[in-house]
């Protein structure tokens, strides 16, 4: 393994992880789907494109097949009789990677409208665990995870850069930004994208907190809020 990314892709590792994360509640969800299509009507990606491949339950298909072949009721008998689905292949997981990572924000709209009460977004989150373990997550996510593990920020933002950004905002607003204040009422944590791409957020927060008359602070030890491990489905990185 190079950093957080496996040295090579492995459908077997992905399937093994799928099976490991399919607990009793998720198995019940997978068995409960009636393929009504309600989730599609709630998905922004389907509504925008009207392409069936963006149906939320379709995004789960490789994990569902792994479950049906290896872990569903009577799976051994079905395999013996040739009735079980084929093994999930590397090519299929490559094809599904954009659907699982790039075409789902885990917004949960599909979960809300599901008449069977299936937590579809939660299932996609668990499917990402298998995809990531097998090496099928987007390369950018692995690189962001490596930076997060080494620097604490997925974009590699360091304290020096944060302080420089704060200094610029202090000059623009005329309001000092308190750092590492013990006993503050509020502690602000920022995403790396806000720190780099939208630094005016810090200035806006300064104005809000000053108007509210409360004590607040930004910690130079824990200023990064982005948890790329949750985004990519890696418990090790998320921890």
Q: Over which residues does each language-model region extend?
A:
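Short, non-ligating residues that shape and space the ligands of small metal-coordination modules
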Residues: 42-45, 49, 116, 120
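N-terminal capping/interface segment
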Residues: 1, 46-47, 66
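N-terminal cofactor/phosphate-binding cores enriched in small/glycine residues
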Residues: 49-62
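Residues that scaffold, gate, or flank divalent-cation-dependent active/transport sites
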Residues: 37
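Iron-sulfur-cluster electron-transfer modules
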Residues: 20-30, 60, 64-239
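DNA-contacting interfaces and partner/effector-binding or oligomerization modules
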Residues: 2-15
């Amino acid at each position: 393994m190079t950093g957080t990314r496996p040295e090579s892709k492995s459908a077997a590792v992905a399937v093994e992880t799928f099976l490991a994360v399919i607990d009793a509640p998720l198995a019940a969800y997978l068995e409960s789907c009636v393929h009504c299509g309600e989730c599609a009507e709630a998905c922004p990606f389907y509504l925008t494109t009207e392409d069936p491949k963006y149906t939320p339950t379709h995004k789960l298909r490789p994990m569902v097949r792994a479950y049906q072949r290896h872990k569903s009721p009577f799976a051994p008998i079905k395999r013996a009789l040739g009735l079980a689905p084929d093994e999930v292949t590397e090519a299929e997981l490559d094809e599904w990677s954009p659907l699982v990572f790039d075409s789902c924000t885990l917004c949960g709209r599909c979960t809300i409208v599901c008449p069977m009460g299936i937590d579809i977004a939660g299932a996609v989150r668990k499917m990402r665990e298998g995809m990531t373990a097998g090496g099928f997550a987007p390369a950018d996510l692995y690189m962001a995870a490596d930076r997060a593990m080494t620097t604490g920020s997925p974009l590699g933002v360091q304290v020096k850069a944060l302080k420089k950004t704060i200094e610029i905002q202090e000059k623009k607003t005329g309001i000092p930004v308190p750092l590492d204040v013990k006993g503050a009422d509020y502690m602000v944590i920022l995403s790396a994208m806000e720190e780099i791409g939208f630094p005016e957020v810090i200035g806006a927060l300064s104005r809000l907190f000053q108007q509210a008359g409360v004590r607040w602070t930004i910690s130079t030890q824990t200023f990064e809020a982005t948890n790329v491990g949750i985004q990519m489905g890696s418990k090790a990185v998320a921890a």
